[in-house]
Amino acid sequence: MSDPLLDAADFTDDGLIPAIVQDAETDQVLMMAYMTAETLQETLDTGRMVYWSRSRQERWVKGQTSGHTQTVEEARLDCDGDTLLFRVHQEGGACHTGFRSCFHRRAADDGWTTDGEKVFDPDAVYE
């Protein structure tokens, strides 16, 4: 049996759809990644975020290496059907650089500034 969200999602010609990930408790935008129909279905089936890595050309379960998992609280589809929004419970940091959010850089008059502190050491996690 197919899922209504999967049926309504409009994937690109290369089989991908962007997924924006937001903290369900704080509303902070954590990251954006891509999904395939298969990783979307796995996410819906398991309640854990599963993505498609464009650089490695393989699926990846968020937190499988780092332990910084994302548990789905809610899934949404935008008005055009071509972008997903997941509200998640984030364990640890979402960003592979060690920050809670991948959007930790903010434009300032003199360049970029960093918001927040690292919540983990990526060198210790990704050896």
Swiss-Prot record:
Catalytic activity: 1-(5-phospho-beta-D-ribosyl)-5'-AMP + H2O = 1-(5-phospho-beta-D-ribosyl)-5-[(5-phospho-beta-D-ribosylamino)methylideneamino]imidazole-4-carboxamide
Disulfide links within the chain: none
GO biological process, one term: L-histidine biosynthetic process
CC cofactor: Mg(2+); Zn(2+)
Compartment(s) of residence: Cytoplasm
A GO CC term attached to the entry: cytoplasm
Keyword Hydrolase: yes
Entry keyword set: Amino-acid biosynthesis, Cytoplasm, Histidine biosynthesis, Hydrolase, Magnesium, Metal-binding, Zinc
Annotated positions binding Mg(2+): 78, 80, 82
Principal location listed in the UniProt entry: cytoplasm
Co-factor note (free text): Binds 1 Mg(2+) ion per subunit. Binds 1 zinc ion per subunit.
Keyword DNA damage: no
Gene3D superfamilies, per the entry: Phosphoribosyl-AMP cyclohydrolase
InterPro entries: PRA-CH, PRib_AMP_CycHydrolase_dom, PRib_AMP_CycHydrolase_sf
Functional pathway: Amino-acid biosynthesis; L-histidine biosynthesis; L-histidine from 5-phospho-alpha-D-ribose 1-diphosphate: step 3/9
NCBIfam families named among the record's database cross-references: PRK00051.1
Protein's job: Catalyzes the hydrolysis of the adenine ring of phosphoribosyl-AMP.
Name of the protein in question: Phosphoribosyl-AMP cyclohydrolase
Organism: Salinibacter ruber (strain DSM 13855 / M31)
Gene of this entry: hisI
